[in-house]
Amino acid sequence: RRGKPLEERSIGNTNLMDEHRKKKLLKNYRPGKLPTDLSRPYFELSKGQDAVTQMETCDLNLWMVGDILLKADKMSMANSLELRVPFLDRKVFELASHIPTKCKVNANQTKIAMRGAAEKTIPAKTADKKKLGFPVPVRAWLRDEQYAGVVRKAFNTPAAEQFFRTKELNAMLDQHISGKRDNWRQIWC
């Protein structure tokens, strides 16, 4: 990704499939807007800022609102849980938005200011722990024939055949199972 504009590099972190792969998998693929078409206005909004700030602006306006917060809200409601997002409290957000990038992240560490503050009240080992979110072992499940069999069955239904080139879907699953390619994210989506 080196040498590409920031907008393309940033999208590359989350883009699951390039246009070529979409054409291979989908029978009637019609390209719509590219991810960079959606993110460009937010990079323009923060033009002149450092790369981290530009990516944060894009994430705040696209990914958080349209993806991660939406999913968290739906999943918590579906399970009768009340979810709190303390870092989105207005006062906390306003304070955090004034923290210089050099106090947020460097080549070796993320969340520098937050970890520094946390180390004053919790063990350093905990404050320095890697962020995990809620990892689900989908990669491993898709290499287990019991679960891969369920996916393969879905890949070979009349509904799947209507929209997808199922031979390509099955090849993608086979590559993942054999370890030739790590396709779990593309299969899962």
Residue ranges and their predicted role:
Residues 1-189:
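Adenosyl-5′-phosphate
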